[in-house]
């Protein structure tokens, strides 16, 4: 960890306004200036900042440069960005995006995060690739997501916004989880958190029903949605509203009850919805070609009761990954030079993927 990273990590718990923080970093010589990076093109927008593809003029390395969006009302850095920086400074794993350093803006009015660059994100790949991922490739992707998530959860962090557009992939087939703007550290006792997190299509039923008790299980529900999306080549539960999202879940998994989900009826919003009576689990009908091991894994991820839902460790032990077709090696994942060049073009599209509209 660089001197700059150590200093930032130590001081971010303080209530710095951003000009004060940026000036302090620059004047003390602890962080580099953004002038040392050549912005090549804008490649996207995270939860709390704009992301550029850039070149480090000192090393010629291509990086992702994320400009932290300012809080105009408070003339400072949003608490969400502070959380993202402090969390990423703690995390070092091959399947989690790397925060290399923090640099300051041209006029000391802003800060930028220098991240490891990944050539593509899974959402845009799924929309544009001519041939869908094979099942062996899907397994390769999911294993990497699960390894990163196991590390994250063992570090007592919940991502809270897992979706295909937040999964990046390098040209060497390495999948990395990104965008930690909504992530939270958790502990015992579990502190209340807002249920208005996680993109709608990937949101766990307990969140839709208003729980403020959030655990790693909300990430695991999202993993189930991601696996299903990779297998089906389209989003599994593309709800247009919260009530529509709940209805889609019930159509797929059946109506929840106290028998299968103790405490369900006491959730804050449980009494506000009139759930259809649907007694069947339709996962097998949705994926008739999927093996029994694959269906068991999906069902384990889609358990209504968060306490019974699969953990990342449970999933990594699944027999689904030990049966044919076996997961391919990351190095054997397909590359997408046409898509990469499209992203790298100066006129690259800046709009969000259709897969992450909610």
Curated annotation (Swiss-Prot):
Residues where Phosphothreonine is found: 194
Coiled-coil segments on the chain, per record: none
Protein name: Cyclin-dependent kinase 10
UniProt cross-references to PROSITE patterns, sorted A to Z: PROTEIN_KINASE_ATP, PROTEIN_KINASE_DOM, PROTEIN_KINASE_ST
Similarity comment text for this entry: Belongs to the protein kinase superfamily. CMGC Ser/Thr protein kinase family. CDC2/CDKX subfamily.
InterPro entries with a match to the protein in the record: CDK, Kinase-like_dom_sf, Prot_kinase_dom, Protein_kinase_ATP_BS, Ser/Thr_kinase_AS, STKc_CDK10
An annotated GO BP: positive regulation of MAPK cascade
Region (Disordered): 332-358
Active site (UniProt): 161 (proton acceptor)
Subunit-structure text: Heterodimer with CCNQ, the interaction is required for kinase activity. Interacts with ETS2. Interacts with PRK2.
Span of domain Protein kinase: 37-321
The protein's enzyme class: transferase
Keywords: ATP-binding, Cell projection, Cilium biogenesis/degradation, Cytoplasm, Cytoskeleton, Kinase, Nucleotide-binding, Phosphoprotein, Serine/threonine-protein kinase, Transferase
Binding site for ATP: 43-51, 66
Annotated Gene3D superfamilies: Phosphorylase Kinase, domain 1, Transferase(Phosphotransferase) domain 1
Catalytic activity: L-seryl-[protein] + ATP = O-phospho-L-seryl-[protein] + ADP + H(+); L-threonyl-[protein] + ATP = O-phospho-L-threonyl-[protein] + ADP + H(+)
CDD domains per the UniProt record, alphabetical: STKc_CDK10 (cd07845)
Record's keyword annotation contains Nucleotide-binding: yes
Localization per Swiss-Prot or TrEMBL: Cytoplasm, Cytoskeleton, Cilium basal body
Organism: Rattus norvegicus
Lineage: Eukaryota, Metazoa, Chordata, Craniata, Vertebrata
